[in-house]
UniProtKB/Swiss-Prot annotation:
Positions of L-phenylalanine binding: T315, Q354, L355, D356, F394, F419
Name listed for the protein in its UniProt record: Phenylalanine--tRNA ligase alpha subunit
GO biological process per UniProt: phenylalanyl-tRNA aminoacylation
Source organism of the structure: Pyrobaculum arsenaticum (strain DSM 13514 / JCM 11321 / PZ6)
Family, as annotated: Belongs to the class-II aminoacyl-tRNA synthetase family. Phe-tRNA synthetase alpha subunit type 2 subfamily.
Length: 488
């Protein structure tokens, strides 16, 4: 008994007499093209007869597919008729009236006085003929030749040549059986000889692998680098600091009392750390502790100030820079991750990025601060920005900064203010004033790129990454730093 590939065996079973290969493929739930290799194999082995016949057939054009879905102009025109008292009226204001009338002329349809008016019996006969023509668009094989010729003139269908393949079994189906297809054999198959009854599936190494879209840079990393470029273009110098910070730089140096609610465990990640910790200079510990005890009127704890935490704000980095540089005229910024015990939702995350900056110099005012904030916002492409009065422990006066999101409306993305003397003086800054701000870059990216869920900034979906990168490229090409030198 001859052993055949299962697909070839199924063709032979179904083709005891001449059958169209398309019909056999449909019964097997396969495409006719995928069966061709088995048809050729059957012919080569002499178990299958094959005949090919070239025929002319009609197929829908793109316009034909549209008309099949939306309706022929004359069909839509007639369906808009209003019938009353045995008369049917169609207004010539119909958008397809011109084309419809050209195709209805053979029925004797003529406009008069801005309308087409027909007795209802005539209207029904014409509509029935047009409906039949409309149905043929979904079943071209049953359409009369004159209808097909009309469709061809209207470029609704086109005539093409197709090769029809007919197959017929050359041997009784009982004389063959299907093989068991294997992609691998075991040592037991070889030892028992079962491998002789298997059909090993060949691997065609010449087949090209499927194309996969080229990877794109991560849009959010590109955005962060761009913000860095903008800040440097505005004359700022970048500074950096540790993610694992002591409470002193994260809170105490910013005149945030040690019993402030923001320092509770529900707002700060406290770290159990047995490694070395870089303590702040002794003179700063003493100066900051003295200001806390004098102004907040409580016993300041040096031990608490040295507790390790994951930084909750990148102001910890800029306050370090201020302590190191002291008085003078300079502008610094930092970009980095911060951490807070937030519940993850479309607007909040327990880990996000901040842009922090300070401008140091004598005679700086609140007006300078708002001007600097507006300058940065416009450099990043945010055209609609609002400021609202706010309170922060370490700045006065203070504002919250909002920008308009296309879906979420006005979204707060940062705070700003002028450092209080209780912050600057313990650090040795007495002649200068310090403008300071901290902005949430995740929310800014959402605003600029039209993203309404903060979790999408870290998506791993390749399709979404390509979509958001395309938005980034569009934004980047239309907005941003022009290389100009900006001054306060």
């Amino acid at each position: 008994m001859l052993v055949l590939h299962p697909a070839l065996y199924e063709i032979i079973v179904r083709a005891r007499d001449w059958r169209l290969l398309d019909e056999v493929a449909k019964e097997l739930g396969m495409q006719a093209e995928s069966l061709m290799r088995y048809v050729e194999e059957g012919r080569a082995k002499g178990v299958l007869q094959v005949e090919k016949k070239v025929v002319e057939v009609y197929e829908l054009t793109e316009e034909g597919r549209r008309r099949a879905a939306e309706g022929l102009p004359e069909y839509n025109f007639l369906k808009s008729a209003t019938c009353d008292g045995g008369r049917c009226v169609v207004s010539l204001s119909h958008p397809e009236a011109g084309v419809a009338l050209a195709n209805l002329a053979k029925f004797g349809v003529r406009p008069r006085g801005g309308v087409v008016e027909l007795d209802e019996e005539t209207y029904r006969k014409i509509l029935s003929a047009v409906e039949e023509k409309q149905r043929y668009l979904s079943a071209l094989e049953g359409a009369p030749r004159d209808v097909l010729q009309e469709f061809a003139r209207r470029r609704i269908v086109r005539r093409v040549e197709r090769t029809l393949i007919y197959v017929k079994a050359a041997v009784p189906p009982e004389s063959v059986r299907p093989a068991e297809v294997k992609t691998a054999i075991t040592s037991a198959d070889i030892a028992t000889g079962r491998w002789r009854t298997y059909l090993l599936k060949p691997f065609d190494l010449g087949v090209e692998p499927p194309e996969y879209p080229a990877p794109v840079p991560h849009f959010f990393n590109e955005f962060l680098d761009y913000v860095r470029e903008v800040m440097i273009g505005l004359g700022f110098e970048e500074v950096r600091g540790p993610v694992l910070e002591v409470e002193f730089w994260n809170f105490d140096a910013l005149f945030q009392a040690q019993d402030h609610p923001a320092r509770e465990v529900h707002d700060t990640f406290y770290i159990r750390w047995e490694g070395p910790i870089e303590a702040p200079p002794e003179h700063l510990l003493e100066a900051v502790g003295r200001v806390h005890e004098e102004k907040w009127r409580y016993k300041w704890s040096r031990e608490k100030a040295l507790n390790p935490v994951l930084r909750t704000q990148t102001t910890a980095v800029t306050i370090r820079a201020l302590a190191e540089r002291g008085d003078g005229e300079y502008k610094v910024f930092t970009i980095g991750r911060v951490f807070r015990p937030e519940k993850l939702d479309p607007k909040h995350s327990m880990e996000f990025h901040q842009l922090d900056g300070i401008v140091v110099g004598p005679g700086l005012t609140f007006k300078h601060l708002l001007g600097q904030l507006e300058q940065i916002a416009k450099a990043l492409g945010m055209t609609r920005v609002r400021f609202r009065p706010a309170y922060f422990p370490f700045t006065s006066p203070s504002v919250e900064v909002y920008a308009e999101h296309p879906k979420l409306g006005w979204v707060e993305f940062g705070g700003a203010g002028i450092f209080r003397p209780e912050v600057t003086e313990p650090l040795g800054v007495r002649k200068s004033r310090v403008l300071a701000w901290g902005w949430g870059l995740d929310r800014i990216a959402m605003i600029l790129l039209g993203i309404d869920d903060i979790r999408e900034l870290f998506t791993k979906d390749p399709e979404k990454l390509r979509e958001y990168y395309a938005r980034w490229v569009k934004y980047r090409s239309a907005t941003g730093s022009t290389g100009k030198s900006y001054t306060l």
